[in-house]
């Protein structure tokens, strides 16, 4: 656990210091690769994330492309079981993600910062996701040899993947990690609740698949 926390701090220090131009260039390359990947996978229902101001792949272009290509787009909201009334996997009132369907790019652009991290999130009344084909996943670091992912430590995405499998008889969407070149790390120590990616798309445009 200490090794994982140290690695997280080291990677965060690097990516938080990156120039915006570097992140923008890599994010554009990733968006083009993701567009091709989703088209070839014949996917229709895609979950993405609203990127933070720094330290991760930006998703504005990806979301715009998804709407242009006729995908159904879903974005996450941070909530907790006492509010959502969803079943509990851990302690009472623990935090988790809900993905909501966005009907247009304008709807996305009109989102306001809210929630514990002041991210642009959907309002609670918007339609929730059921079946998802693809989830585009953020992270602090990714291992392109094994598919391992290290998040920010709160467990939101691993919790969502576990909930999804319980609700859908063991099935899960295609999990696609979006990774700046500066986020590539190996090895990444995993705990029993950590989910690995099905593929990772990197800032140089490469796509790494895992069985």
Curated annotation (Swiss-Prot):
Disruption phenotype: Abolishes methenyltetrahydrofolate synthase activity and leads to accumulation of folinic acid. Leads to a striking methionine deficiency when combined with ADE16 and ADE17, 2 isoenzymes involved in the purine synthesis. InterPro entries: FTHF_cligase (IPR002698), FTHF_cligase-like_sf (IPR024185), NagB/RpiA_transferase-like (IPR037171). Keywords: ATP-binding, Glycoprotein, Ligase, Mitochondrion, Nucleotide-binding. One of its GO terms (molecular function) is ATP binding. GO terms for biological process: folic acid-containing compound biosynthetic process; tetrahydrofolate interconversion. Pfam families: 5-FTHF_cyc-lig (PF01812). It is an enzyme of class 6 (ligase). ATP binds at residues 4-8, 151-158, 194. Substrate binds at residues 56, 152-156. N-glycosylated. Gene3D superfamilies: NagB/RpiA/CoA transferase-like. Signal peptide: none annotated. Belongs to the 5-formyltetrahydrofolate cyclo-ligase family. Only enzyme known to utilize 5-formyltetrahydrofolate (folinic acid) as substrate. Contributes to tetrahydrofolate metabolism in an alternative way of folate biosynthesis. May regulate carbon flow through the folate-dependent one-carbon metabolic network that supplies carbon for the biosynthesis of purines, thymidine and amino acids. This is 5-formyltetrahydrofolate cyclo-ligase. It comes from Saccharomyces cerevisiae (strain ATCC 204508 / S288c).
């Amino acid at each position: 656990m200490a090794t994982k926390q140290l690695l997280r701090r080291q990677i965060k220090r690097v990516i938080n210091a990156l120039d915006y131009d570097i992140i923008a260039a890599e994010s554009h390359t990733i968006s083009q690769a993701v567009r091709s990947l989703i088209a070839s996978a014949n996917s229709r229902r895609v979950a993405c994330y609203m990127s933070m101001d720094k330290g991760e792949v930006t998703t504005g272009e990806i979301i715009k492309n998804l709407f242009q290509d006729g995908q159904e787009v879903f974005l996450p909201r941070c909530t907790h079981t006492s509010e959502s009334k969803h079943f509990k996997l851990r302690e009472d009132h623990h935090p988790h993600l809900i993905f909501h369907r966005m009907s247009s790019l304008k709807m996305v652009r009109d989102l306001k910062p809210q929630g514990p991290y002041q991210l642009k999130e959907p309002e609670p009344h918007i339609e929730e996701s059921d079946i998802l084909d693809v989830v585009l996943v953020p992270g602090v670091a990714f291992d392109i040899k094994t598919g391992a992912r290290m998040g920010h430590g709160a467990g939101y995405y691993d919790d969502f993947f576990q909930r999804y499998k319980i609700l859908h008889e063991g099935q899960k969407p295609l999990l696609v990690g979006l990774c700046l070149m500066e986020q590539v790390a190996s090895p990444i120590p995993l705990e029993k609740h950590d989910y690995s990616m099905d593929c990772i798309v990197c800032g140089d445009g490469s796509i790494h698949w895992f069985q």
